[in-house]
């Protein structure tokens, strides 16, 4: 199944993936995360994002058959959606955290 135009994904099957959903919110950057679930991962993600100065405005968390499907609405410290360079940083940070790096 093809990904809708305008969406960016990083990762390969079996590894953590982060999908930016452009236009999903005017108030925040929407980041969908899929990964193998493990104890403490949600806490680690929140801590990593906060450590980078990225605020989680809202999170929708789900786990199916040991796989997470978490959607984060994130903003910068100014409360605005992240600019492109910060989005790339958030994607990289989330993938590294999910992969235990």
Question: Residue locations for each model-derived region?
Answer:
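Regulatory modules associated with amino-acid/nitrogen control
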Residues: 1-101
